[in-house]
């Protein structure tokens, strides 16, 4: 078993994603980003571990699910206080924290972009600088 697939390593992957994707967001937004990652783990459309969800597509051009994993920058935690905060959030969520902020979202993006993929999904919430989405319900045709 690879280290990143071990259960006790999953909180580290979640904390890292929260730090690099949402550390400047309000706490509510950080929890919502954690929900997206955990909602993906629970979905059959995504990998079944936090580390695999976070790193999905890394190394493939335009395939990263989380931009920090493919931006070409060295990822270094420079703000210890912010990291401690996201570690606590990660641990709460991994230990069964209630998922009620994102509206069941499995996707999000920053408000500074308008990706074409977002049109295919239902917007559930905007928190801070992130817009959250879930798969759109298909209407039945008569």
Predicted regions and their residues:
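Bacterial extracytoplasmic/cell-wall-associated proteins, especially those involved in peptidoglycan
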Residues: 1-142
């Amino acid at each position: 078993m690879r280290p990143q697939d071990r259960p006790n390593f999953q909180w580290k992957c979640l904390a890292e994603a929260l730090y690099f994707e949402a550390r400047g967001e309000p706490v509510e937004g950080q929890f919502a980003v954690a929900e997206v990652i955990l909602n993906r783990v629970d979905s059959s459309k995504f990998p079944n571990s936090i580390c695999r969800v976070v790193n999905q597509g890394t190394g493939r051009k335009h395939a990263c699910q989380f931009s920090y994993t493919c931006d070409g920058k060295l990822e270094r935690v420079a703000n210890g206080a912010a990291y401690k905060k996201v570690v606590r959030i990660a641990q709460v969520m991994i230990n069964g924290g209630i998922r009620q902020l994102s509206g069941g979202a499995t996707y999000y993006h920053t408000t500074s972009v308008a990706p074409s993929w977002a049109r295919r999904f239902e917007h559930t919430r905007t928190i801070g600088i992130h817009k959250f989405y879930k798969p759109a319900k298909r209407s039945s045709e008569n």
